[in-house]
Amino acid sequence: MFTGDNSGNWLFRALHKAGFANRPLSEHRNDGLRLTDCYITATLRCAPPQNKPTPKEILNCKEYLLREIELLKNVRVIVGLGKIGFEAALNAYRESGKVEFKSKPRFAHCAMYKIGGLTFIASFHPSQQNTFTGRLTEPMLDRVFTTARTQLQ
């Protein structure tokens, strides 16, 4: 996931700087990239038309995310890339019974919420739309993952 595309270039550089990846670039599946204390998943399993998933598409893929949450036993920090990713993570963790909240945390870049022993951090997605326009800069993305690293210590 993210391997060989511009979003991945941004993501893996930030992960590398924060100590989550052994190299700053992933070009293909056998390039030697190794993640440490990090797991990457997605709300959707396919690219939606015009990059705007429908609620039905999100619902169709939800079971995969719930199953991954069930399998991952030592999660302490969740970084949601984009509002859709952040909200999907919150909803999936709530549905899995691992967290409860009365009012849903609001999405804002680098916002951090501690809920039920987990830390949720929101980030703009490193899409070309966000990076080319300057909505997301490298220092902004670096800050998200250094914050995540700090929360693990």
Where are these regions (language model features)?
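A polyanion-binding, active-site-adjacent surface
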Residues: 1-107, 111-153
